[in-house]
Amino acid sequence: MPNQIRAQLLELNKNTKSNNVKQQLEIIENINSNDSIELKDLADLFFERITGPNYKSNCVDGLIYEKLLNSKNQEIVKFASNLCPDGIVPLRSAQQMNYKDLQMLLTHRDLLKADQLTQQKLIQLAGVNAQTRNWLYFTDIKKIPAQDLQTIDKLWHTHSKGKFGLFVQRQIWLSVGKDWGKFWQKIGWEVDRIPCRYPEEFQWNSHGPRGHLPLFNQLRGVQVLSALFTHKAWENY
């Protein structure tokens, strides 16, 4: 492994609380997935990070975990799978909802299916009978437990290099003064004030604009998203 990258990894491990997340992500992105030595060093770093005292998962660890789990080195894949069989985000639910399937889709970067599954889970959490209605009313949102919204958000945020998730969308919405037109443009759901067509005009990868995913149907109005963004889940989050 080049000494420069090794030194960067060591520095990364020292600065786990650094605010320079972008630089940390770039270091990880530059690691050669076909180089077993580099992957082994990355695996060692991952072990040190997640077994440390007071560990809390973040998007840096999310990218490391994805890099290890999606490598072609079966020894590395087995190591990551055994170390974190349920992923690195605690899958907490007030309704005993199973989030392992969503975690796996996001880890393997199948964002279209992850988005569809997210909508299904929100409908289930709200107690809606999916056989009679497969969308949410704004009155359904308050029925969704805060803990579950936080888990869904953390999964999206952790496995998107910090770009996606409900809380990121909420931050953007607040930053544009709750102006929905500006919000749609900012997150790439509209282009030149024309709503994007589903699914072909949305970006199902990490190259989409910040806040691009998960999707909600803005053609049904803004009340559902407004209810989500003002949910008690984000108080002291």
Swiss-Prot record:
Disulphide bond pairs: none
Domain of life where this protein originates: Eukaryota
Keyword Lyase: no
GO terms, molecular function: tetrapyrrole binding
Listed GO CC annotations: chloroplast
Similarity annotation: Belongs to the ycf53 family.
Protein's recorded name: Uncharacterized protein ycf53
Species of the source: Pyropia yezoensis (Susabi-nori)
